[in-house]
Amino acid sequence: MSANQDYIVADIGLADFGRKEIAIAETEMPGLMACREEFGASKPLKGARITGSLHMTIQTAVLIETLVALGAEVRWASCNIFSTQDHAAAAIAASGVPVFAVKGETLEEYWTYTDKIFQWADGGVSNMILDDGGDATMYILLGARAEAGENILINPGSEEEEILFAQIKKRLAATPGWFTKQRDAIKGVTEETTTGVNRLYQLQAKGLLPFPAINVNDSVTKSKFDNKYGCKESLVDGIRRGTDVMMAGKVAVVCGYGDVGKGSAASLSGAGARVKVTEVDPICALQAAMDGYEVVQLEDVVSSADIFITTTGNKDVIRIEHMRAMKDMAIVGNIGHFDNEIQVSALRNLKWTNVKPQVDLIEFPKGNRIILLSEGRLLNLGNATGHPSFVMSASFSNQVLAQIELFTKGENYKNEVYVLPKQLDEKVARLHLAKLGAKLTELSEEQAAYIGVKAQGPFKAEHYRY
């Protein structure tokens, strides 16, 4: 990167390729294109300086350019070291938006890039965060706490945390007061995924959330579509691209049966696999059983199953003793946000053979091997290209509306976690119906009055579960 280039990408020469794919994606993302049409003239995000930490894909490129069309300035990094699509990053960088994302970047580079998305060329600060997993938010909040004298940058729990702490210390030494200045300028954060939302709720419970947050993940048009239908298509895509293994007839174990687990089980079942599910929640376990899946304990199937997928958002779901007991050439992968669902760190002292990018063969002393996808990180983005554009349009439309809401009406919100109102959820769904040729039935005024709603919606009470 030359001195006048405010970006880091793998190859800026891929920009034309990326631009062609962005043009195709735009035709599959009616929600985002409708946001441009509705808000492009008024530019409600004029003055917004958005720091974005979210998978740098073709679909994200359409999101970024929508934010820019609505008046925002944007700086962007990926939220995963393997999820960047280099041609997408190149196209966005070539358009003039600072982006710092390379597929296969190191953890050191990852946290350096996270730091860079808060460094504006004129020395100014961000006033909004668009996050996926919470890393950008946590980077600023941990740094500000350290500046305040809290002794929190000790005893890292993982290699990544050690690298994160080192990056924070580096910034603390270089620019005292920087983190506090950044934190105090933030009007709000919009969070994309379950893991990041959990972090925000934990901060709220402890009284440590310093600005309002919108939980985009729990918008119905995100969690019930992206998490379920997106995984339904992208999980098997990632396994196939990574391994070329036929799934029909194989035994696949899905750990977790939340929305992501439901989509993952359906994905594998649709490919002909015989799916078993592990669960800690009796409600989700009962759902899995009544959906026709055998609900098991991992220990009972670990030596007989062929494919293992974690979807829980928790840590140490598949541990070293489980992998040691697996049959030769079992496939192990994760579609939850972080890499600690599988105890990858416990595998590091074993023999690794890299087959191709994001596919490793790991051999145990007794001779059995496992195929590990994307080093335990999101395999649908590491081994493939993630969810299809159409379903991401729904998720990202929620992000755009949430950014507008917090930026323009932030004074109406306390330092708590909110969800978008149901009428906006329904609006996002409505924007995607025509693309599928779907036609809504309309309530008469009499029918609407009978069930206690307005004829144009919202059609469900806030407590309704879809």
Swiss-Prot record:
Its EC number is 3.13.2.1. One of its GO terms (cellular component) is cytosol. Its main location: cytoplasm. Pfam families: AdoHcyase (PF05221), AdoHcyase_NAD (PF00670). Binds 1 NAD(+) per subunit. One of its GO terms (biological process) is L-homocysteine biosynthetic process. The keyword NAD applies. NAD(+) binds at residues 193-195, 227, 256-261, 279, 314, 335-337, 380. Keywords: Cytoplasm, Hydrolase, NAD, One-carbon metabolism. Belongs to the adenosylhomocysteinase family. PANTHER family: ADENOSYLHOMOCYSTEINASE. May play a key role in the regulation of the intracellular concentration of adenosylhomocysteine. This is Adenosylhomocysteinase. The lineage of its organism: Bacteria, Pseudomonadati, Pseudomonadota, Alphaproteobacteria, Hyphomicrobiales. The gene is ahcY.
